[in-house]
């Protein structure tokens, strides 16, 4: 009798170790090595065939490790939320995009509430691209517009997600198309030049 059998009412083969991994992307390989995939299929009454090949996953990991040794590409993430978990999915998406392009991506958070015309150049210095993050409401909006205008006038690639993309469209309408009062009804219900993006 295995020692694990004495302490819980779980089959020995259904108890797996939570092994430390260098990256979360190694966890599926570590779990498969302990037979967790087959055990789950058995418990669910599903046929257990051949162990699924994780070849593509392993190749991704190899690329990820190789990319980590390359010179990083710096991307600024402009947003208002101090809690970095608010942008976790964006950071991971940028990191994975870097892996598939054989580059390490370093994401630098830039607080949009503290961004001004006077400090934007220093805040975005050395950035290969800028991501304007999502959010709601007025807080931090002015700083996003400052960042967008700076990146547009300095030819820095800029991406926007949700409100970030709306801000890019509004800044363009205001400063390129000449609609100084362009806005979104989300922020100004009475704007005469409403920009609504379908996304």
Per-region residue spans from a language model:
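N-terminal beta1-alpha1 cap of cysteine-dependent amidohydrolase-like domains
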Residues: 4-198
């Amino acid at each position: 009798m295995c020692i694990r059998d004495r302490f819980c009412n779980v089959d020995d083969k259904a108890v797996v170790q939570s092994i430390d991994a260098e990256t979360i992307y190694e966890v599926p390989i570590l779990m498969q090595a302990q037979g967790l995939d087959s055990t789950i299929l058995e418990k669910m009454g599903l046929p257990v065939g051949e162990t699924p090949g994780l070849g593509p996953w392993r190749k991704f990991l190899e690329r990820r490790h190789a990319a980590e040794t390359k010179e990083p590409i710096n991307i600024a993430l402009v947003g208002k939320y101090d809690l970095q978990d608010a942008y976790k999915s964006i950071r991971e998406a940028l990191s994975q995009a870097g892996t598939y392009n054989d580059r390490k991506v370093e994401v630098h958070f830039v607080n949009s509430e503290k961004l001004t015309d006077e400090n934007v150049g220093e805040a975005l210095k050395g950035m290969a691209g800028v991501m304007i993050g999502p959010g709601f409401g007025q807080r931090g909006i002015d700083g996003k517009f400052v960042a967008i205008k700076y990146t547009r006038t300095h030819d820095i690639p800029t991406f926007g997600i949700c409100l970030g993309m709306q801000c890019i469209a509004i800044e363009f309408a205001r400063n390129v198309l000449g609609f100084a009062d362009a806005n979104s009804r989300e922020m100004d219900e009475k704007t005469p030049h409403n920009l609504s993006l379908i996304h």
